[in-house]
Curated annotation (Swiss-Prot):
Allosterically activated by benzodiazepines. Activated by pentobarbital. Inhibited by the antagonist bicuculline. Inhibited by zinc ions. Potentiated by histamine. It comes from Mus musculus (Mouse). Residues 39-274, 322-333, 473-474 are extracellular. CDD domains: LGIC_ECD_GABAAR_G (cd19000), LGIC_TM_GABAAR_gamma (cd19054). This is Gamma-aminobutyric acid receptor subunit gamma-2. GO terms for cellular component: axon; chloride channel complex; cytoplasmic vesicle membrane; dendrite; GABA-A receptor complex; GABA-ergic synapse; inhibitory synapse; plasma membrane. It comes from the Eukaryota. It is a multi-pass membrane protein.
Amino acid sequence: MSSPNTWSIGSSVYSPVFSQKMTLWILLLLSLYPGFTSQKSDDDYEDYASNKTWVLTPKVPEGDVTVILNNLLEGYDNKLRPDIGVKPTLIHTDMYVNSIGPVNAINMEYTIDIFFAQTWYDRRLKFNSTIKVLRLNSNMVGKIWIPDTFFRNSKKADAHWITTPNRMLRIWNDGRVLYTLRLTIDAECQLQLHNFPMDEHSCPLEFSSYGYPREEIVYQWKRSSVEVGDTRSWRLYQFSFVGLRNTTEVVKTTSGDYVVMSVYFDLSRRMGYFTIQTYIPCTLIVVLSWVSFWINKDAVPARTSLGITTVLTMTTLSTIARKSLPKVSYVTAMDLFVSVCFIFVFSALVEYGTLHYFVSNRKPSKDKDKKKKNPLLRMFSFKAPTIDIRPRSATIQMNNATHLQERDEEYGYECLDGKDCASFFCCFEDCRTGAWRHGRIHIRIAKMDSYARIFFPTAFCLFNLVYWVSYLYL
């Protein structure tokens, strides 16, 4: 008879303890053998992965973060900088330029929108926790020490407050602090307008500590110190963004030596607007003033009105061109061009005034007047045989009407009494006989229009050649 604690199977006898051991070994082998593991669908695998990630991420109770912050702020004095009395606090800075523009040339300033970041170490903010970094909002900013950074050349600066203050604070467990904020700054830029509108400028953005000298705070640029956004959305209008560069310098003042960080934005002016608004109209007005050289000199109202109109138009254009500039005391490139155009237009008017003056004030020959007054001179005057090469008056019969063909007027002018015109012009009596002195300029007043048709266009073309080569390539 068998014992109650044993089972008889065939010729083998098994105890309950041995049976339990065998069961455990079989379950262990089945769990290790991959063929008996169940196949999981993709959805099950994703859930498993997410669950695994959730398990590996330590769950941080809200109370733990509150305890950490309370412990950090307990006994913390935000009026004192880190490592005070030990070493200077090192501030690493970088910025992201969101946009630049517009540039106001009259006020000599430009607008820039940036994200400004500062990083430093504060040993008082170290903590031991599974949390590596505390991501905090702007409410924590006023409770810890923040660098007193200010922008030296800013005229006006605004921090963004909609919908909440655009400030961010990060505290790592090793005491590293990151503080970023978004700013819109109207910064001063001293524009040198000598080459306007072909000028290029480097507009700075300078910042430093307001109260801590170099012995207390030292600023340094990060490796990727300044980055820019999409320049196509920038409102530069008249300018093109060329590039940027950043520098570090020490400025000495009566209160100490301060580390000053600067970013220079290189801008180049676009000429399209000023070419359409100033250069082309001024050139056309100058060319229009030359039309008077082809109008008959006896058409006094036509030539006078044309000259006065072009002069007044140039005056208006010069006034409009100056409105887009500050009231600088030096001459710009545009001022030079407009002034020369005004001189050409005014000279065309003066040319006709000179021509009309000499034509309307011509006098008969003095010798002829004497002969008319004294009949004895007419009787006894002896004339040497000469050949008169002047064109004589001719009578032309046309349609039963008699017309006198006018003699060339250039032989009818005399030098004006009381005028030393012989020093500059050839008096007409002398010109006819060829008795004018050596070195005297031989100018025929009647042909001033013919001379002006060649001189004015040639001089203006030479001026444009020198002007554009000098300002664009030299």
